[in-house]
Amino acid sequence: LGDVYKRQENHRYLSDLLSYVAVGARSVENQEHRLVSSGLDIPVGMKNPTSGDLSIMLNSIKAAQGDHTFLYRGWEVESKGNELAHAILRGSVSKHGNNHANYHYEDLRKLHDAYCTGNYKNPAVIVDTNHSNSGKKYLEQVRIANEVLHSMRHSDDIKNMVKGFMVESYIEDGSQKVEDGVYGKSITCLLYTSPSP
Protein backbone atom coordinates (compact mmCIF):
# COMPACT_ATOMS: atom_id res chain seq x y z
CA LEU A 1 0.00 0.00 0.00
CA GLY A 2 1.30 3.45 -0.88
CA ASP A 3 0.37 6.87 0.44
CA VAL A 4 1.00 10.52 -0.27
CA TYR A 5 2.87 11.71 2.80
CA LYS A 6 1.11 14.91 3.85
CA ARG A 7 1.12 14.69 7.64
CA GLN A 8 4.11 12.93 9.18
CA GLU A 9 2.28 12.21 12.43
CA ASN A 10 -0.15 9.91 10.56
CA HIS A 11 2.67 7.57 9.56
CA ARG A 12 2.80 5.74 12.89
CA TYR A 13 -0.86 4.73 12.47
CA LEU A 14 -0.25 3.28 9.00
CA SER A 15 3.38 2.12 9.18
CA ASP A 16 2.50 -1.58 9.35
CA LEU A 17 0.51 -1.25 6.10
CA LEU A 18 2.67 1.06 4.00
CA SER A 19 5.36 -0.15 1.63
CA TYR A 20 5.77 3.17 -0.22
CA VAL A 21 5.21 6.87 0.42
CA ALA A 22 5.40 9.92 -1.80
CA VAL A 23 6.14 13.45 -0.65
CA GLY A 24 3.93 15.76 -2.69
CA ALA A 25 4.91 18.74 -4.80
CA ARG A 26 3.79 21.22 -2.15
CA SER A 27 5.53 19.40 0.72
CA VAL A 28 8.87 18.57 -0.89
CA GLU A 29 10.49 21.79 0.37
CA ASN A 30 9.39 21.15 3.96
CA GLN A 31 12.38 20.29 6.15
CA GLU A 32 10.36 18.06 8.48
CA HIS A 33 9.18 15.90 5.56
CA ARG A 34 12.81 15.51 4.51
CA LEU A 35 14.03 14.62 8.00
CA VAL A 36 11.26 12.13 8.75
CA SER A 37 11.76 10.53 5.31
CA SER A 38 15.41 9.92 6.24
CA GLY A 39 14.25 7.63 9.05
CA LEU A 40 11.74 5.52 7.12
CA ASP A 41 12.58 1.95 6.11
CA ILE A 42 10.51 2.03 2.91
CA PRO A 43 11.05 3.81 -0.43
CA VAL A 44 10.11 7.50 -0.42
CA GLY A 45 9.43 9.33 -3.66
CA MET A 46 10.03 13.09 -3.73
CA LYS A 47 7.91 14.91 -6.30
CA ASN A 48 9.31 17.91 -8.11
CA PRO A 49 7.64 21.10 -6.84
CA THR A 50 4.89 22.72 -8.88
CA SER A 51 7.46 25.28 -10.09
CA GLY A 52 9.34 22.44 -11.80
CA ASP A 53 12.66 23.34 -10.15
CA LEU A 54 14.48 20.00 -10.09
CA SER A 55 17.14 21.32 -7.71
CA ILE A 56 14.52 21.54 -4.94
CA MET A 57 13.51 17.91 -5.50
CA LEU A 58 17.15 16.79 -5.68
CA ASN A 59 17.97 18.66 -2.45
CA SER A 60 15.06 16.88 -0.81
CA ILE A 61 16.36 13.50 -2.00
CA LYS A 62 19.86 14.34 -0.77
CA ALA A 63 18.49 15.33 2.65
CA ALA A 64 16.37 12.17 2.92
CA GLN A 65 19.35 9.98 1.99
CA GLY A 66 21.52 11.52 4.71
CA ASP A 67 21.58 10.76 8.43
CA HIS A 68 20.19 13.33 10.86
CA THR A 69 19.55 14.12 14.49
CA PHE A 70 16.37 16.14 14.99
CA LEU A 71 13.39 16.76 17.26
CA TYR A 72 10.20 14.90 16.37
CA ARG A 73 7.03 14.84 18.48
CA GLY A 74 9.00 15.96 21.56
CA TRP A 75 11.76 13.37 21.16
CA GLU A 76 15.33 13.64 19.96
CA VAL A 77 15.50 11.27 17.00
CA GLU A 78 18.45 9.89 15.05
CA SER A 79 17.96 8.67 11.49
CA LYS A 80 20.41 6.67 9.42
CA GLY A 81 19.25 8.00 6.03
CA ASN A 82 16.96 6.45 3.47
CA GLU A 83 18.95 5.17 0.49
CA LEU A 84 15.66 4.46 -1.30
CA ALA A 85 14.63 8.13 -1.51
CA HIS A 86 14.11 8.96 -5.20
CA ALA A 87 12.54 11.37 -7.69
CA ILE A 88 8.99 11.56 -8.95
CA LEU A 89 8.53 13.71 -12.06
CA ARG A 90 5.02 15.22 -12.12
CA GLY A 91 5.39 18.18 -14.47
CA SER A 92 5.09 21.82 -13.46
CA VAL A 93 2.81 24.84 -13.64
CA SER A 94 4.00 28.24 -14.86
CA LYS A 95 3.14 31.48 -13.09
CA HIS A 96 0.48 31.92 -15.79
CA GLY A 97 -1.16 28.59 -14.91
CA ASN A 98 0.14 26.64 -17.92
CA ASN A 99 1.10 22.99 -17.45
CA HIS A 100 4.56 21.86 -18.56
CA ALA A 101 5.45 18.18 -18.86
CA ASN A 102 8.80 16.78 -17.68
CA TYR A 103 8.62 13.12 -18.77
CA HIS A 104 10.20 13.52 -22.22
CA TYR A 105 13.53 11.96 -23.21
CA GLU A 106 15.39 15.24 -22.65
CA ASP A 107 13.89 15.65 -19.17
CA LEU A 108 14.85 12.12 -18.15
CA ARG A 109 18.35 12.62 -19.55
CA LYS A 110 18.71 15.88 -17.56
CA LEU A 111 17.64 14.12 -14.36
CA HIS A 112 20.08 11.27 -15.01
CA ASP A 113 22.94 13.74 -15.49
CA ALA A 114 22.01 15.56 -12.27
CA TYR A 115 21.99 12.27 -10.38
CA CYS A 116 25.46 11.42 -11.75
CA THR A 117 27.02 14.74 -10.75
CA GLY A 118 25.39 14.80 -7.31
CA ASN A 119 26.66 11.50 -5.87
CA TYR A 120 23.20 10.13 -5.03
CA LYS A 121 22.51 6.60 -3.81
CA ASN A 122 20.31 4.39 -6.01
CA PRO A 123 19.39 6.97 -8.69
CA ALA A 124 15.76 6.27 -9.54
CA VAL A 125 12.63 7.98 -10.82
CA ILE A 126 8.93 7.26 -10.94
CA VAL A 127 7.08 9.14 -13.70
CA ASP A 128 3.73 10.57 -12.63
CA THR A 129 1.57 10.22 -15.74
CA ASN A 130 -1.12 12.59 -14.49
CA HIS A 131 -0.97 16.03 -12.83
CA SER A 132 0.92 18.57 -14.97
CA ASN A 133 2.50 15.86 -17.13
CA SER A 134 -0.93 15.16 -18.62
CA GLY A 135 -2.27 18.67 -18.19
CA LYS A 136 -4.82 16.95 -15.93
CA LYS A 137 -6.20 15.14 -19.00
CA TYR A 138 -6.38 11.70 -17.41
CA LEU A 139 -6.81 9.82 -20.72
CA GLU A 140 -3.27 10.92 -21.69
CA GLN A 141 -1.74 8.71 -18.98
CA VAL A 142 -1.39 5.60 -21.16
CA ARG A 143 0.23 7.59 -23.99
CA ILE A 144 2.67 9.21 -21.55
CA ALA A 145 3.69 5.83 -20.10
CA ASN A 146 4.25 4.53 -23.63
CA GLU A 147 6.46 7.51 -24.48
CA VAL A 148 8.59 6.89 -21.39
CA LEU A 149 8.87 3.20 -22.32
CA HIS A 150 10.04 4.32 -25.78
CA SER A 151 12.72 6.51 -24.16
CA MET A 152 13.80 3.54 -22.04
CA ARG A 153 14.31 1.45 -25.19
CA HIS A 154 16.67 4.11 -26.57
CA SER A 155 18.83 4.73 -23.51
CA ASP A 156 20.23 2.24 -21.03
CA ASP A 157 20.77 5.09 -18.56
CA ILE A 158 17.08 5.98 -18.67
CA LYS A 159 16.06 2.31 -18.62
CA ASN A 160 18.07 1.74 -15.44
CA MET A 161 16.81 4.92 -13.78
CA VAL A 162 13.04 4.63 -14.44
CA LYS A 163 11.52 2.27 -11.87
CA GLY A 164 7.84 2.71 -12.64
CA PHE A 165 4.84 4.93 -13.18
CA MET A 166 2.35 6.67 -10.97
CA VAL A 167 -1.06 6.32 -12.63
CA GLU A 168 -4.20 7.75 -11.07
CA SER A 169 -7.16 5.42 -11.39
CA TYR A 170 -10.38 4.72 -9.55
CA ILE A 171 -13.60 2.70 -9.81
CA GLU A 172 -15.38 5.02 -12.28
CA ASP A 173 -13.72 6.64 -15.28
CA GLY A 174 -13.36 10.39 -15.40
CA SER A 175 -13.25 13.11 -12.86
CA GLN A 176 -15.73 15.20 -10.94
CA LYS A 177 -15.89 18.31 -8.84
CA VAL A 178 -15.61 17.67 -5.12
CA GLU A 179 -19.18 18.78 -4.52
CA ASP A 180 -20.63 16.38 -7.16
CA GLY A 181 -20.36 13.42 -4.77
CA VAL A 182 -20.55 10.59 -7.33
CA TYR A 183 -19.58 7.33 -5.60
CA GLY A 184 -16.52 5.65 -7.12
CA LYS A 185 -15.45 8.66 -9.19
CA SER A 186 -12.32 10.55 -8.28
CA ILE A 187 -11.57 14.19 -8.82
CA THR A 188 -8.60 13.21 -11.07
CA CYS A 189 -8.64 9.56 -12.15
CA LEU A 190 -8.66 6.99 -14.94
CA LEU A 191 -10.92 3.91 -14.84
CA TYR A 192 -8.91 1.23 -13.03
CA THR A 193 -9.71 -1.38 -15.71
CA SER A 194 -8.41 0.83 -18.56
CA PRO A 195 -5.73 -0.82 -20.70
CA SER A 196 -2.18 -0.64 -19.42
CA PRO A 197 0.74 0.44 -21.63
Q: What would you call each of these model-derived segments?
A:
Residues L1-Q8, Y192-P197:
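Conserved small/polar residues in nucleotide/adenosyl-binding loops
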Residues E179-T188:
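Acidic, Ser/Thr-rich peripheral helices and adjacent loops at domain boundaries
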